[in-house]
Every structure is written in structure tokens, then in C-alpha cells.
């Protein structure tokens, strides 16, 4: 069919309505002043949004770099009940929703495992792919590739299983707080170890054996719980502020569109 386009001659006969020049200048003056104010407000909101996120990130990094007395470094495998990788092939999916969901690397982001967009499989495939272990609420999942180093905690009781390039950590509650593990894997310390262990000249990935040998800095369980409480509280406040600034940015953009609409409908 080709690309539809409007003949250049057609533009010449389009009729537009516009006010006298003094009125145009008045409207332009109003819009320029308003848009300058909106641009300043948006810049401030975006800066505040960045600062809110940076505050949490800064505190998270300080926790794992300015460690107090009693902290030790141990192999992550020694603090977990299990470390489980995926079956080494892609599960055959179906084109309809089922009760059996495959977690992909794209589902793991920013401390969360998002199950809103997943691939589905049959019950039989699910049973085969979970024959070694069924994922459960509280498992911490790490992407080994595409991209490498994203971390999220599973907070669902849905029937899920690991897709390719994922590994899950199940904390031993006698030694390790699961949320402390989540935060530790997001820290610069562990992320640096993951990058150092990366292999592959084109696509960076971490081998399964290396995922078990990460060196985890851990204090006592009591201090882990106190650290988690502080980080959870700060994260919650950061998310509240981020939501506030995002709503403000959306409102400013809506105001800009509203002003343009009013200007070209003779309402200014």
C-alpha cells in the first residue's frame, strides 16, 4: 500500500483561524511566561526526584561499606538453605494464560519480581521445570545475564518457575535475614563482585558456580534485622517522595497541555 502522505499543494489551501497580531502577541506572552514557570517547576521536581532516590542509594551503600564490629565475610552458599539455577533449556510456552508462570530476566527489577507480564506453560511443563525445587515467597532471584545483576524478591504464592539465566537464593533463617540478603545483593559491594566474575566478550554473564561463591558481608541476625528495618523505612519514604514528585511532573505536563488548548480556543 505504501506510506500515506498529504500532497504539498493541499497544505496551501488549509484554512486556519487566528486573532489579530496584538492578540497573538498577548497570548504568546502569557504562554511564554507560563511555560517558563512550568519548566522551572519541572526541573525542580526532577531534581527532587533524583535526590530522593539518591538518598536511599547512598544509605544502602554506606551500610555495606562502613561495616561495624562483628561483621564477617562468608560464602553466600554457607548462609542459604539452597541456591537453585534454572533448567538449562527454554521451557515450551503456551499462548493462553494458565496457572503456571515462567519468571524471565525482564521480570526481575529494582528489588521486585513483577509477574504482570510473564510467559505461561502447561502443568506438565511446570512440574518438569520445578522437579528440583519449587520457588516460594521470600526467595531472592538474581539475573545472571541480559542484564546481569538485577535482583528481586518473590512476594507471590503463584505457581512460578525460573526461566533461563536466573538463579534463586533461599536464605537460611538461622543465619540470614532474607531482606538483608536482598539489600546486600543490591549493594555496590556485591554488584562489584558480580561484575568482576562476569565472562563473555559480547554478552556479559555470571556462571552458576560463581553465583554460589559470592562473599557476603554479614553481622549478627539482630543487627541484620535492625539494618533491614532502617532500610525498609527509608525505602518506603523514598518511594512516597518519588510518587509525589512523579505526580507533580504529570500535573505540570497536563497544565501545559491545558494552557495550549485554552490558548487556541480563545480562552486566555
Kindly label every feature range from the protein language model.
Residues 259-268:
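Acidic, low-complexity, intrinsically disordered peripheral segments
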Residues 131-134, 159:
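Residue-level "contact hotspot" at macromolecular interaction interfaces
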Residues 1, 88-90, 109-121, 140-163, ...:
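Short, ligand-facing micro-motifs at secondary-structure edges
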Residues 1-22, 144, 160-167, 176-179, ...:
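A short glycine-rich beta-alpha junction/loop motif
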Residues 13-29, 33-36, 40-87, 213, ...:
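Non-catalytic DNA-recognition/assembly elements of restriction-modification systems
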Amino acid at each position: 500500500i505504501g506510506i500515506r502522505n498529504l500532497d504539498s499543494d493541499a497544505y496551501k489551501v488549509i484554512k486556519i483561524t487566528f486573532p489579530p497580531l496584538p492578540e497573538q502577541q498577548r497570548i504568546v506572552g502569557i504562554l511564554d511566561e507560563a511555560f517558563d514557570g512550568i519548566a522551572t517547576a519541572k526541573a525542580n521536581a526532577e531534581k527532587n526526584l533524583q535526590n530522593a532516590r539518591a538518598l536511599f542509594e547512598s544509605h544502602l551503600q554506606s551500610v555495606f561499606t562502613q561495616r561495624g564490629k562483628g561483621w564477617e565475610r562468608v560464602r553466600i552458599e554457607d548462609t542459604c538453605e539452597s541456591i537453585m539455577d534454572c533448567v538449562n533449556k527454554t521451557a515450551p510456552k503456551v499462548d493462553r494464560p494458565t496457572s503456571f508462570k515462567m519468571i524471565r530476566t525482564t521480570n526481575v527489577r529494582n528489588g521486585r519480581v513483577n509477574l504482570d507480564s510473564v510467559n505461561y506453560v502447561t502443568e506438565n511443563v511446570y512440574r518438569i521445570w520445578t522437579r528440583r525445587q519449587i520457588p516460594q515467597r521470600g526467595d531472592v532471584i538474581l539475573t545472571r545475564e541480559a542484564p546481569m545483576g538485577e535482583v528481586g524478591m518473590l512476594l507471590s504464592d503463584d505457581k512460578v518457575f525460573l526461566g533461563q539465566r536466573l538463579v534463586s537464593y533461599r536464605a537460611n533463617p538461622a543465619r540470614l535475614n532474607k531482606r538483608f540478603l536482598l539489600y546486600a545483593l543490591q549493594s555496590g559491594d556485591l554488584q562489584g563482585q558480580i561484575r568482576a566474575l562476569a565472562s563473555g566478550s559480547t554478552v556479559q554473564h555470571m556462571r552458576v558456580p560463581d553465583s554460589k561463591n559470592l562473599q557476603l558481608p554479614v553481622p549478627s541476625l539482630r543487627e541484620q534485622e535492625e539494618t533491614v528495618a532502617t532500610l525498609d523505612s527509608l525505602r518506603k519514604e523514598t518511594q512516597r517522595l518519588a510518587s509525589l514528585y512523579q505526580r507533580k511532573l504529570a500535573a505540570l505536563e497536563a497544565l501545559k497541555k491545558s494552557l495550549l488548548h485554552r490558548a487556541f480556543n480563545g480562552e486566555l
